[in-house]
A protein has these predicted regions:
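Extracytoplasmic/lumenal domain signature
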Residues: 1-8, 42-82, 88-94, 105-155, ...
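Long, low-complexity segments enriched in small/aliphatic residues
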Residues: 19, 136, 143, 151-154, ...
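Structural signature of eukaryotic scaffold interfaces centered on beta-propeller domains
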Residues: 12-23, 87-92, 162-173, 245-247, ...
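Extracellular structured ligand-interaction cores
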Residues: 13-17, 53-54, 83, 103-104, ...
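Short coil-to-beta-strand
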Residues: 23-30
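Active-site glycine- and acidic-residue-rich loops that bind
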Residues: 4-14, 157-162
Length: 335
C-alpha cells in the first residue's frame, strides 16, 4: 500500500460468500480490488500491490486468521475484480480450488497451501504482456503500468468481464466447469482524487466497445476440463448471459440471458436441448430441488445486475432490454 495511511486504503470489498472445506476446516474468501479503480487515483502504482486485494484468502473459521493467500492481480488498475466464486474440486491427487474473475482467467490452486497449479484464458485479454506459466505472476502491459491521471488506455475484457457474478458450475459427470462469460472491451482513464479522509469513490471515465474477433457476440459459455484446463466446447451468442450456471446429474446445464431465454444444454457438447422465452431478462442464480419424487428448476427474472447488464445495453441496442417483470419461474424436469 505504499505510504498510504490506513484511513486512505480503500476497496478490498467482498462481493459474494466464500466456500468452506470441512475436512481442512478452511474458508476460502474472494476479495475485490483496491479503490479508486486506477492506481494513480489512489496515489499508488501497479507496483504497489495493495496487499490482500484481488485475492483468495484461506481463513481459519475459528478466529479469522489468514492461513494462506493468493493475490491474483497485485496493484489492479482497471476495475477488473478477482472476487467471485471459489469452487473446490479434487484433481490429479490434489485438493484444488478454481476461481475466475473479470480478466476471464481461470486460476487453479492447491487449497491446502495456496500453491499455483495452472491457469487458462477463456476470453481474449490484452491486459497482461505475460503470465508466468510456473508461478502465475502477471505482468501488466507497459502503457497500463505507466498510466497517470487522465491517460486513456484501451483494454480487453471490460469491467463487465470476462467473468462476473454469474457463477460457474461443476459437472462431475463430465469433469468440467461450465463458465458463463461476457465479451466486451473498455477504454478507461483515471480521475484525480483528493487523498484526504472522506474522499474516494471509483473515479474514472470509461467507454465500452465490442471485443475484436467476436462478431458482436457478447455472450459466451465454455466448458473447461478441471484436470487439463483444456476447453471441451464453447458457444457464443449476441445476448449476454445473466444467470449463474446450474448443472444436474442428468448431464444438463441451465443458463439464462438478457434476451429472456432460459436454456438447458448438454454438458458434454454444449448443444441446446430445451429452451423457453420468459417475460423479461433472466438473471440470478437458478436452483434445483425435489418434491415428492419430482425434480424442479427455479430461476428468477427482473432488473438490476450491474455492469454485466448495463454494458450490453450500450453494445447490443438491437436487443430489447425489458424494464419490468420481476418474477420467479419454476419448471419440472420430466424423465
Amino acid at each position: 500500500w505504499g505510504d498510504l495511511p490506513l484511513a486512505l486504503r480503500g476497496g478490498g470489498d467482498s462481493w459474494i460468500p466464500g466456500s468452506y472445506d470441512a475436512n481442512l476446516n478452511l474458508i476460502y474468501w474472494p476479495v475485490a480490488q483496491a479503490k479508486p479503480w486506477v492506481p494513480a487515483s489512489r496515489g499508488l502504482t501497479v507496483y504497489d500491490p495493495a496487499l490482500y486485494t484481488n485475492s483468495t484468502l484461506a481463513l481459519d473459521p475459528g478466529d479469522g486468521s489468514i492461513q494462506w493467500y493468493r493475490q491474483h492481480v497485485p496493484g489492479e488498475a482497471l476495475d477488473l475484480d478477482e472476487a467471485f466464486e471459489q469452487v473446490l474440486i479434487n484433481s490429479g491427487g490434489r485438493q484444488a480450488l478454481y476461481t475466475i474473475g473479470k480478466h476471464g482467467i481461470l486460476w487453479k490452486l492447491d487449497r491446502v497451501s495456496g500453491e499455483f497449479l495452472g491457469y487458462t484464458e477463456t476470453v481474449y485479454q490484452n491486459v497482461f504482456d505475460r503470465i508466468d506459466p510456473k508461478t502465475g505472476i502477471v505482468t501488466y502491459r507497459q502503457d497500463i503500468a505507466d498510466a497517470g491521471i487522465g491517460d486513456w488506455v484501451s483494454v480487453c475484457p471490460s469491467t463487465a468481464g470476462g467473468h462476473n457474478w454469474h457463477a460457474m458450475a461443476y459437472s462431475p459427470e463430465s469433469r468440467a466447469l461450465i463458465i458463463p462469460l461476457s465479451q466486451s472491451c473498455l477504454e478507461i482513464a483515471g480521475r484525480e482524487v483528493a487523498l484526504v479522509e472522506g474522499s474516494g469513490g471509483s473515479q474514472a471515465d470509461r467507454k465500452w466497445f465490442e471485443m475484436p474477433g467476436t462478431d458482436g457476440n457478447l455472450g459466451k459459455l465454455t466448458a473447461i476440463d478441471v484436470d487439463t484446463l483444456e476447453e471441451h466446447w464453447s458457444v457464443e451468442q449476441r445476448a449476454a448471459y445473466m444467470t449463474a450456471v446450474l448443472t444436474t446429474g442428468g448431464r444438463l446445464a441451465f443458463v439464462g440471458d438478457v434476451d429472456r431465454y432460459f436454456r438447458a444444454l448438454d454438458v458434454d457438447t454444449g448443444s441446446v436441448l430445451w429452451e423457453t422465452r420468459l417475460g423479461t431478462s433472466v438473471q440470478g442464480f437458478p436452483v434445483t430441488y425435489g418434491v415428492d419424487g419430482d425434480q424442479y428448476i427455479s430461476v428468477s427474472t427482473g432488473l438490476g445486475g450491474g455492469s454485466p447488464r448495463r454494458v450490453p445495453q450500450l453494445l447490443t441496442p438491437d436487443i430489447q432490454h425489458p424494464d419490468t417483470g420481476n418474477a420467479l419461474y419454476v419448471f419440472r424436469l420430466t424423465p
